[in-house]
């Protein structure tokens, strides 16, 4: 399988409402089409994740100008900003209980192309069962999780990133102040 095939199979799986295991610019993640309520529910279930712990969405870089720097950064926006100003089409079970939503622009050609072809944000959360350590590489992903997702993107060499830690997380408060949640 080549990169073009991997992208097409991933987009097809997402359009069919499937959950996926895929590489990002930080660590391997599991995700789904952010517009698909049922797929988001299945993602919470397969990770055994409490709904109080929201998941972030990856968005296409051409539409967003958020942060720049050496380390990928997830921004958590309050509902009044992401809902009214960002025009995101996402499932209603994706934002946190307080209405906030984590958003990141991935610096990863595979993710960018999948998001572009899908035409929608991609849910992203670490490829681990809730409460367990995040895997630093594909070989550390638990077999149980690989069995639970509907589609696994193959670990092609051109898809692997040298970055092996989660993104920095900054929460934007309604008044515009910023709080660093994960440096």
PLM-predicted stretches and their roles:
Residues 1-183:
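Active-site-adjacent structural elements in enzyme catalytic cores
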């Amino acid at each position: 399988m080549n990169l073009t095939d991997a992208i097409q199979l991933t987009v097809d799986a997402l359009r069919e409402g499937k959950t996926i295991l895929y590489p990002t610019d930080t660590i391997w993640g599991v995700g789904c089409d952010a517009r698909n309520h049922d797929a988001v529910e299945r993602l919470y279930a397969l990770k055994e994740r409490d709904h109080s712990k929201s998941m972030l969405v990856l968005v296409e870089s051409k539409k967003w100008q958020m942060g720049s720097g050496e380390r990928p950064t997830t921004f958590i926006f309050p509902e009044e900003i992401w809902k009214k100003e960002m025009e995101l089409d996402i499932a209603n079970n994706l934002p946190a209980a307080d209405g906030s939503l984590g958003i990141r622009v991935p610096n990863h050609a595979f993710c960018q192309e999948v998001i572009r072809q899908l035409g929608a944000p991609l849910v992203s959360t670490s490829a681990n069962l809730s409460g367990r350590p995040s895997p630093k590489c594909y070989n550390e992903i638990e077999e149980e999780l690989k069995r639970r997702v509907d589609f696994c993107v193959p670990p092609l060499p051109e898809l692997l990133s040298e970055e092996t830690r989660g993104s920095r997380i900054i929460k934007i408060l309604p008044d515009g102040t910023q709080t660093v949640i994960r440096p």
